C-alpha cells in the first residue's frame, strides 16, 4: 500500500483500514506460531502499512487542529 493511496482515505476509512491491518497482523502471527506461514515477508509489509496509516491519521488530525 502506498502512502499516496492512504492519504486519499477519510478519517473513518483510516480507522477501518487500521483495524483490518491489525486483524491481519494477528492472523499472520498466529500462522507463524503454528508453522503455517508461507510468506514471512508479509508480516513486515503489514507492520509498515500499520505505521503508514497511523502516521497519516496523525498528520490529518494535526491539520484539523491547526
From Swiss-Prot:
GO terms for cellular component: cytosolic large ribosomal subunit. Signal peptide: none annotated. GO terms for biological process: translation. It comes from the Bacteria. Keywords: Ribonucleoprotein, Ribosomal protein. The keyword Translocase does not apply. The keyword Ribonucleoprotein applies. GO terms for molecular function: structural constituent of ribosome. Belongs to the universal ribosomal protein uL29 family. PANTHER family: 60S RIBOSOMAL PROTEIN L35/50S RIBOSOMAL PROTEIN L29, LARGE RIBOSOMAL SUBUNIT PROTEIN UL29C. This is Large ribosomal subunit protein uL29. It comes from Rhizobium johnstonii (strain DSM 114642 / LMG 32736 / 3841) (Rhizobium leguminosarum bv. viciae). The gene is rpmC.
Amino acid at each position: 500500500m502506498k502512502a499516496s493511496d492512504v492519504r486519499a482515505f477519510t478519517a473513518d476509512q483510516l480507522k477501518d483500514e487500521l483495524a483490518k491491518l491489525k486483524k491481519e497482523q494477528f492472523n499472520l502471527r498466529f500462522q507463524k506460531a503454528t508453522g503455517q506461514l508461507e510468506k514471512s515477508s508479509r508480516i513486515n509489509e503489514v507492520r509498515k502499512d500499520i505505521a503508514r496509516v497511523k502516521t497519516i491519521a496523525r498528520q490529518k488530525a494535526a491539520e484539523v487542529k491547526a
